[in-house]
């Protein structure tokens, strides 16, 4: 069976490259100089000076793979990535006030619905019409959010538009919010709160799920030598409205699916990042090592 068409790329990180270099050097020094690279042991010289056979090489490879995984785990624990930024598209209430000002009303709960408390507004852009230039209202919105006192269910902003945006608001006004985890709170909050709260119940929304599979399960036993068993992280679960949206396109897709489910499919749970996997496999010339960067999922989102 021919190997699947996967893109093979070198892994990142100096430690990983150095260890792979050592293993390649071991293969060059220990592999037979003539004949088939996968020749049977009886075809090689016997005695303490004999060449390493395939089983011994597999053992060395498994040991190296264990050390690579240990190094990767230490790197992950020491440099945990920040949670992904989030985007919200809202439809605020806008009306014309006195002296050419615009009165904007936004539901406070909709600003960070479905996100942990650590998320804060990073930027706010108001589009009065679909063709209008975005109007940055980050400062007045943050100022309204920082006011102390009783928290009203809605934020009310009185805005003076720039001259080139002096126009009557239309029914298509949109507010685009870009949210990030507040500085200094990301790691603690990421552990204290789940990234998203699934409205369908625990375990039903888009998430990672690990499945163990052998080379025989995958149909790879005729060309892959090591590892003999893989832990494959898969993205499974449903994508309810605005849950873990990958981007603005995914949010629009979710909205249109709610309006026209027969024409627009719902967003799907797909990988957002991957963990590199090293495979030792047979080639026409012997044995080769390849790193597959798009085989095992590391994170999931809806797209």
From Swiss-Prot:
Detected in plasma (at protein level). Highly expressed in liver. Expressed in the distal small intestine, colon and kidney. Expressed in skeletal muscle in response to mitochondrial stress. Expressed by cardiomyocytes, expression is highly increased in heart diseases. Also detected in subcutaneous fat. Keywords: Cleavage on pair of basic residues, Cytokine, Disulfide bond, Glycoprotein, Hormone, Secreted, Signal. Its main location: secreted. GO terms for biological process: cellular response to chemical stress; energy homeostasis; GDF15-GFRAL signaling pathway; negative regulation of appetite; negative regulation of growth hormone receptor signaling pathway; negative regulation of leukocyte migration; negative regulation of multicellular organism growth; negative regulation of SMAD protein signal transduction. Disulfide bonds join 198-205, 206-269, 235-300, 239-302. The keyword Glycoprotein applies. Induction: Produced in response to various stresses, such as metabolic and toxin-induced stresses or drugs. Expression is activated by ATF4 and DDIT3/CHOP transcription factors downstream of the integrated stress response (ISR). Induced in macrophages in response to lysosomal stress in a Tfeb-dependent manner. Expressed in response to mitochondrial stress. Expression is induced by metformin, a blood-glucose-lowering drug. Expression is induced by cisplatin and camptothecin anticancer drugs. Expressed following sustained high-fat feeding or dietary amino acid imbalance. Also induced by physical activity. PROSITE patterns: TGF_BETA_2 (PS51362). GO terms for cellular component: cytoplasm; extracellular region; extracellular space; Golgi apparatus; nucleus. It is found in: Secreted. GO terms for molecular function: cytokine activity; growth factor activity; hormone activity; protein homodimerization activity. Glycans are attached at residue 71. Residues 1-30 form the signal peptide. Residues 31-188 form a propeptide. Disruption phenotype: Mutants weight more, have increases adiposity associated with increased spontaneous food intake and exhibit reduced basal energy expenditure and physical activity. Female mutants exhibit some additional alterations in reduced basal energy expenditure and physical activity. Mutants mice on high fat diet develop obesity compared to wild-type mice. Mice also show progressive postnatal loss of spinal, facial and trigeminal motoneurons. At behavioral level, they exhibit a task-dependent increase in locomotion and exploration and reduced anxiety-related behaviors across tests. Pfam families: TGF_beta. SMART domains: TGFB. InterPro entries: Cystine-knot_cytokine, TGF-b_C, TGF-beta-rel. Gdf15 treatment is efficient to reduce obesity and promote weight loss in mouse. Administration of Gdf15 reduces the adiposity and corrects the metabolic dysfunction of mice with diet-induced obesity. The combined administration of Gdf15 and leptin (Lep) leads to significantly greater weight and adiposity loss than either treatment alone, indicating potentiation between Gdf15 and Lep. Hormone produced in response to various stresses to confer information about those stresses to the brain, and trigger an aversive response, characterized by nausea and/or loss of appetite. The aversive response is both required to reduce continuing exposure to those stresses at the time of exposure and to promote avoidance behavior in the future. Acts by binding to its receptor, GFRAL, activating GFRAL-expressing neurons localized in the area postrema and nucleus tractus solitarius of the brainstem. Belongs to the TGF-beta family. Homodimer; disulfide-linked. Interacts with GFRAL and RET; ligand of GFRAL, which mediates GDF15 internalization and cellular signaling through interaction with RET via the formation of a 2:2:2 ternary complex composed of GDF15, GFRAL and RET. This is Growth/differentiation factor 15. The lineage of its organism: Eukaryota, Metazoa, Chordata, Craniata, Vertebrata.
